Every structure is written in structure tokens, then in C-alpha cells.
Amino acid sequence: MLYSTCNFLQKVTLNCFSNYEVSGRENVPPVGPLIVVSNHLSNIDPSIVAVSVSRRLKFLAKSSLFAGPFISGLLRWYGAYPLHRDRIDVASFKWALNQLREDGVILIFPEGTRSRGSMIRAKSGVARLVQMSDATILPVGITGTEHIGNVLRVVNPTGDIKVNIGSPFSLPKMDGPIDSPILKSMTDLIMERVSVLLPETYRGVYSLKKDHNK
């Protein structure tokens, strides 16, 4: 109930205060475990992706946002789970894996933090999660939210906000232990699929990549 209500209100504010556009909604798989992977520009990106994708999303959020029982309860009710970025967070990884094993949808921002407009090098946890879950990957590119810094701007999003949803894809299943170079290569492949959904100026370290969505 809270998730649907929040998303409805977010759509209202987007339509009232911004030039909001979504392309590629038809690419969202209707069923099955799904990892939605996006670039990250603003604290309001999770809600922007949530209203743009037709399935119920759950996501990891930095643990510092879970301040106090009220905010913590609200975030969890909306679908968030705390991620401790200062260490290897086994609990959050297991939580995400359990959601996928129940055919759920997890939203991940592999860069690990907001970029300053162009993509930065992603962390390899997303590739490990894909390997352990066999989930389909859905790349998403967001532009226009980088000027919205404060999370309270969720009620007043302005500017040209574009969400581009790419074609879903899968990675080959690897048998046995996977070393760091292979995980990095898989992560780069995933992020390249995100980067081609963005204008060149947003692609950062993943610029000049082939457009897999054409």
C-alpha cells in the first residue's frame, strides 16, 4: 500500500514540476527474478526508477539513511534494506539473494555512490549477485536528476528527467570459484549496457561503448 501510494505521488510531482519521460517500458520482463541496474546521480533515483519500471522494486540503501525508528520503518516498508558501505555486508547480499530466489526485483546502483554527472567505476558485487541468482539483468539509464541533491526534493523534482530502459540480458553461468578479474569483466559488461542508454557526456569511464540495444 505504501509503495503504491508513494509511487503515485511521485508520478504526480514529476508530471507537475518536471519534464519527465520514460522510454523502453516494454522491455521490462513481466515475471522472474530481475536485477535492475542503473547509473546513480541523485538520492531520489530509487523512486524515479520505481515509478518507471512496471514491477515492484526492492533496493539497497546506505545504512546512514536509516536514522531513527520512524525513517527506518518507512524505508523498509517502501522496500529498502540497509547497506553498510564501509565493510563487506554479507547480510545485505543475502537479503538481495533471497528476494531474487523468490522471483523478486532488486534495484542496484553498482557505482556504489552518486556520481557527479558522469559514470564512475562500478563495484563487482552486482556481478557476483547475478552469478549466484541466475537473474535477468535490466539496464536503466537516468539523466536530469544530478541537480537534485537533497532527498526532500522528491516532492519537487524539476528539470528534464529522462529514464531509458534497455533490453534485458543475461550473463553466462560460471562454474566453480570466480576470481576478481572475471568479476570485474562481467561488471564492466553490465555497466556498458547501462552507458549506451545515456548521452555520451554521462558515460564517464564507460564511454565509447557499442550500443547493445540497437
Residue ranges, per PLM feature:
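Catalytic core of membrane glycerolipid acyltransferases/transacylases, capturing the structured
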Residues: L2, C6-F8, N15-C16, V28-R87, ...
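Short gly/ser/thr-rich secondary-structure transition/capping motifs
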Residues: N15-S23, R87, T145-H147
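Catalytic-site beta-strand/loop segments enriched in glycine and acidic/polar residues
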Residues: Q99-V126
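A cross-family acyltransferase "interaction/gating" segment
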Residues: M119-P181, D211-N213
